[in-house]
Swiss-Prot record:
Pfam family, one: FBPase
Annotated organism of origin: Cupriavidus taiwanensis (strain DSM 17343 / BCRC 17206 / CCUG 44338 / CIP 107171 / LMG 19424 / R1)
Gene: fbp1
Protein name listed in UniProt: Fructose-1,6-bisphosphatase class 1 1
UniProt keyword Kinase, yes or no: no
Binding partners and assembly: Homotetramer.
Binding, Mg(2+) 1: 91, 113, 115
Family: Belongs to the FBPase class 1 family.
Enzyme Commission number, as recorded: 3.1.3.11
Keyword Cytoplasm: yes
Binding residues for substrate: 116-119, 208, 274
InterPro entries: FBPase_C_dom (IPR044015), FBPase_class-1 (IPR000146), FBPase_N (IPR033391), FBPtase (IPR028343)
């Protein structure tokens, strides 16, 4: 069996579909190399003294872990000099990072959550890196925040790396979803699954049940029906899964189906949700849709949401298509009665 590396896959996709420009191919390869470096740091853990808090906070008001800071720096350092990017934006930084004048500038914008699920770092549970690529609207001009504020439909590539028992890179460039496993001996990502498909139906849901009392009625209705099992209106038993790492939960859904929900709750009613639209929801929504699933905020398709600011938050409901459509319908019915 011929082993297909990430580089070979990207070159062959470029030849077949002519949708991957050489600059985009090289950008994806650089991001993949950065993910290998992050995977190496994660795997060393306490041996390298990288566990625990960094003693700082990010723009989200969250305490940064040492590996949050390390992963962010790895991605910045790896991508700033290649000539493929005009700027980068990170969940960990208040403003975007424009490529310094000492380096050539390209036509793409890169956004990333350098280490998703960082509350799991010290307990050795799967975490990951999420990334999204956009075209720079006006290449060659000074970058502004407005250049990043494009709906998710404008993404030219999206993906994540999950650092678990294996390190797996999951990628879409608009032609389906493909998984690459890191061969540590060879030092390369190898294609291990092509054209990933999410089943339309499922018996698994992922949500933080401890917040149930804070949810809106449509979400409670859906979960109540799941919990009622084969004696309830759904006529089947459901299992719950919750890792508290979006990368890990979405990876499970891409692998075997399910629905992931991080909904609005009434503790912070002025915020539309918890997850970040640009760094988490949009890239994951693109991946899920490319795999035949669906992703909404309860009211509209996530990829259609027009961003208004870099660190905008959003409710997220994604996964198996029929389940996502059911939850969305419950929201629409509740709005119609209001």
């Amino acid at each position: 069996m011929t082993r297909i590396s990430l580089t070979r896959y990207l070159v062959e996709e470029q030849r077949k579909h002519n949708t991957i420009q050489p600059e985009l191919r090289l950008l994806i390869e650089v991001v993949a190399r950065a993910c290998k470096a992050i995977s190496n740091a994660v795997s060393k853990g306490a041996l390298a003294g990288v566990l625990g808090s960094a003693g700082t906070g990010n723009v989200q008001g969250e305490t940064q872990q040492k590996l949050d800071v390390i992963a962010n720096e790895v991605l910045l350092d790896a991508n700033e000099w290649g000539g493929h990017l005009a700027a980068m934006a990170s969940e960990e930084m208040e403003s975007f990072y424009e490529i310094p004048n000492r380096y050539p500038k390209g036509e793409y914008l890169l956004m990333f959550d350098p280490l998703d699920g960082s509350s799991n770092i010290d307990v050795n549970v799967s975490i990951g890196t999420i990334f999204s690529v956009l075209h720079m609207p006006k290449p060659g001009q000074t970058v502004t925040e407005a250049d990043f504020l494009q709906p998710g439909t404008h993404q030219v590539a999206a993906g994540y790396a999950v650092y678990g028992p294996q390190t797996t890179l999951v990628l879409t460039v608009g032609n389906g979803v493909h998984m690459f496993t890191l061969d540590r001996e060879a030092g390369s990502f190898v294609l291990t699954q092509s054209n990933v498909t999410i089943p339309e139906d499922t018996k698994e849901f992922a949500i933080n049940m401890s917040n149930m009392r804070h949810w809106a009625p449509p979400v409670r209705k859906y979960i109540d029906e799941c919990l009622a099992g084969d004696e309830g209106p759904r006529g089947k038993n459901f299992n719950m899964r919750w890792v508290a790492s979006m990368v890990a939960d979405v990876h499970r859904i891409l692998t075997r189906g399910g629905i992931f929900m991080y909904p609005w709750d009434k503790r912070e009613p002025e915020k539309p949700g918890k997850l970040r639209l640009m760094y988490e929801a949009n890239p994951m929504a693109m991946l899920v849709e490319q795999a035949g699933g669906a992703a909404t905020n309860g009211e509209q398709r996530i990829l259609d949401v027009q961003p208004e600011k870099l660190h905008q938050r959003v409710s997220v409901i994604l996964g198996s298509k029929n389940e996502v459509e059911r939850v969305t319908r419950y929201h629409q019915e509740a709005q119609a009665k209001a």
